[in-house]
């Protein structure tokens, strides 16, 4: 069984990813369209894909579409610094296809099996987001399968409404089949400065300052994120791409990246290859591998290196979901209720970050948490007023409440609490997640929709585009072949 698991996972190291070419792409699109048109018109459809990075349920009543021919890189143009990519291509493959050219996507989400199409329709952030925004902001053009069964090409000049409203639509408007994206030149190494903080106020001020100036202590910063262990212990990691060769750390073996950040005071320095920097969080799924014992030194020595990756930990999570292993073997014998999963990425402004962190660490024992600043990419304000339906929104990307020139701090926490954490008389049912939603709303924030959400329709509309999701859906999916945005992200359709 272990041999099969290893065989079914690709190496954690780089592999050669040759372009699939346009002929194979057209064949993949034809296969997708045949599967779409084979589904009765009164039945809903979804992608029949092997991977998912969503932490919410979904209905099994939809017919799966065949996307097996749409998971590659079509071509890379090193002169124009662009790539033509199929929607189901993972970032792991995309990075391995572009790095040999000295190029990489502007923003690479943290986990290897996130797909380019998924990151664009479902958002994604990483340490370059304070400079380069979100993954969809470096998209030049998309082909999208809509609910009518048509492949619609959209860009800043063509079908602009769909181009602006597709990000954060989570498949409610269709699926990206092809994406043409910009790439950035990148150097082979990354120097890290890991700065220790002892209070949330100075942490938040520094996040805001570096996000605006792109420098720290007069040195340019290319990547910025952070980890908070407690109110007295937090770190910001300032990354700088460099050509300078030298020794590098390897966190795919015995050492654990987030633990390496911890030091008493001042600045710790580290160096990684650019590929290891891109995937520094995937090896231990940030820190979530500890739930499976993978950070225990004895276990780590025998844990196959090839299985130190988020996609394998996901398989373990799915086993637990299917058979309720933790509940049946640990909690139920002790008379304890089921645990409440608390997996969220919320966003607040820097001035509200200290209050949220103070509250969160008092309200739960969950630690550590991840910090990642976001600013929309420069020039994106030109999209405002573009299109017909989308022109009604002051946001460049109307289904997500970010504005140009404003810094937001993504706060990620991925753990759980006891089922009776909030109310012993009413365990479970998302109680603590609802409390978090209320606190974030109180602070004028919002959250990503990849996990459970409990907003009322009215609250949801205030945050995620008002009636625009329904208005664009009436054009691209008049027969409702895909679930609506609220239906999909809150009602788990």
Residue ranges and their predicted role:
Residues 348-354, 358-363, 367, 409-410, ...:
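Extended C-terminal subregions enriched in glycine
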Residues 19-113, 117-128, 371, 440:
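Glycine-rich N-terminal segment of FAD-binding domains in flavoprotein oxidoreductases
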Residues 323-331, 420-421, 428-493:
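Activity-critical C-terminal alpha-helical subdomain
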Residues 1-24:
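Intrinsically disordered, low-structural-confidence terminal and linker regions
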Residues 121, 140-355, 362-365:
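C-terminal substrate-binding/cap subdomain adjacent to the FAD-binding core in PCMH-type
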Residues 60, 235-248, 310-321, 333-334, ...:
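Short glycine/threonine-rich loop-to-helix capping motif typified by GTGT followed
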Residues 46-47, 222-229, 341, 346, ...:
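A short glycine-rich, hydrophobically flanked beta-strand micro-motif that places a catalytic Asp/Glu
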Residues 49-56, 227-233, 318-322, 373-388, ...:
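A glycine-rich phosphate-binding loop feature that marks nucleotide/adenosyl-phosphate handling sites
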């Amino acid at each position: 069984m272990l041999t099969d698991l290893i065989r079914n996972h690709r190496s954690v190291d780089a592999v050669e990813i040759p372009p699939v070419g346009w002929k194979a792409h057209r064949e993949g699109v034809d296969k997708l369209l045949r599967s779409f048109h084979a589904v009765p018109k009164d039945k809903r459809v979804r992608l029949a894909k092997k991977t998912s990075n969503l932490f919410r349920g979904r209905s099994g009543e939809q017919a799966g579409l065949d996307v097996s021919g749409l998971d590659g890189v079509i071509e890379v143009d090193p002169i124009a610094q662009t790539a033509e990519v199929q929607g189901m291509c993972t970032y792991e493959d995309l990075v391995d296809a572009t790095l040999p050219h000295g190029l990489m996507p502007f923003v690479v989400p943290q986990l290897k099996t996130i797909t380019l199409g998924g990151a664009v329709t479902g958002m994604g952030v990483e340490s370059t987001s304070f400079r380069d925004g979100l993954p969809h902001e470096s998209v030049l053009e998309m082909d999208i399968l809509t609910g009518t069964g048509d492949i619609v090409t959209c860009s800043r000049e063509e079908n602009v409404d769909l181009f602006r409203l597709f990000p954060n639509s989570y498949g409610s408007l269709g699926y990206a089949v092809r994406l043409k994206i910009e790439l950035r030149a990148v150097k082979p190494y990354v120097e890290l400065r890991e700065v220790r903080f002892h209070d949330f106020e100075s942490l938040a001020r520094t996040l805001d300052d570096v996000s605006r100036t792109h420098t720290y202590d007069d040195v340019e910063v290319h990547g910025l994120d952070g980890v908070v262990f407690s109110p007295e212990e937090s770190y910001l990691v300032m990354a700088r791409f460099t050509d300078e060769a030298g020794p590098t750390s390897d966190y795919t073996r015995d050492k654990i990246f987030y633990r390496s950040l911890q030091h008493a005071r001042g600045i710790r320095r580290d160096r990684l290859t650019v590929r290891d920097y891109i995937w520094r969080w995937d090896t231990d799924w940030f820190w979530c591998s500890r739930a499976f014992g993978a950070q225990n030194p004895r276990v780590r020595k025998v844990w196959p290196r090839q299985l130190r990756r988020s996609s394998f930990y996901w398989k373990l999570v799915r086993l637990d979901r299917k058979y309720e292993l933790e509940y049946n073997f640990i909690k139920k014998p002790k008379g304890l209720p089921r645990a409440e999963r608390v997996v969220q990425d919320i966003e607040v402004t820097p001035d509200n970050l200290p209050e949220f962190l103070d509250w969160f660490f008092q309200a739960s024992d969950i630690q550590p948490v991840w910090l990642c600043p976001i600013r929309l990419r420069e020039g994106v304000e030109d999209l405002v007023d573009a299109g017909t339906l989308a022109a009604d929104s002051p946001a460049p990307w109307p289904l997500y409440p970010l504005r140009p020139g404003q810094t937001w701090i993504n706060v990620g926490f991925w753990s759980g609490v006891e089922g009776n954490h909030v109310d012993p008389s009413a365990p479970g049912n998302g109680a603590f997640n609802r409390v978090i939603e209320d606190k974030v709303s109180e602070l004028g924030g919002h959250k990503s929709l990849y996990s459970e959400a409990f907003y009322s329709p009215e609250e949801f509309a205030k945050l995620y585009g008002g009636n625009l999701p329904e208005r664009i859906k009436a054009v691209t999916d008049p027969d409702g072949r895909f679930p609506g945005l609220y239906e999909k992200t809150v009602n788990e359709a």
